[in-house]
């Protein structure tokens, strides 16, 4: 979604790093991360919560300063560990139950942009 890509760009404009973290092992995910110029892309990650310390070390950030958007049960553990979590409108009920912010838009249809706008508004 072009709006999601613009969300990444707007975050980069204020020096906020973006990371793709997916359980998929697909060239499509990597290509999308490259296209929107994400700072890093981790693919084929089954235990996303186990990657948190790696991400924190790589970008010199605390978990409490990380915002994360996820849509399914494999996102729940990491959502509980970060400072701000969100779920798209079409996320699972389990993910919605632990998220700090529920997007009005669906994943792939602007949910990331909606979340990035929330993050950007908090920086003003």
Q: How should each PLM-predicted stretch be described?
A:
Residues 1-47:
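Alpha-helical substrate-recognition element adjacent to the catalytic core
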């Amino acid at each position: 979604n072009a709006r999601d890509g613009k969300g990444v760009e707007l975050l980069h404009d204020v020096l906020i790093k973006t990371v793709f973290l997916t359980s998929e092992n697909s060239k499509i995910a990597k290509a999308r991360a490259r296209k929107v110029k994400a700072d890093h892309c981790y693919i084929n990650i089954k235990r996303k919560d186990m990657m948190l310390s790696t991400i924190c070390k790589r970008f010199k950030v605390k978990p409490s300063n990380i915002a994360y958007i996820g849509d399914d049960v494999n996102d729940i553990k990491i959502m509980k560990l970060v400072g701000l979590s969100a779920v798209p409108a079409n996320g699972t009920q389990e993910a919605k139950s632990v998220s700090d912010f529920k997007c009005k838009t669906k994943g792939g249809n602007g949910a990331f942009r909606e979340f990035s706008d929330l993050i950007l508004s908090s920086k003003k």
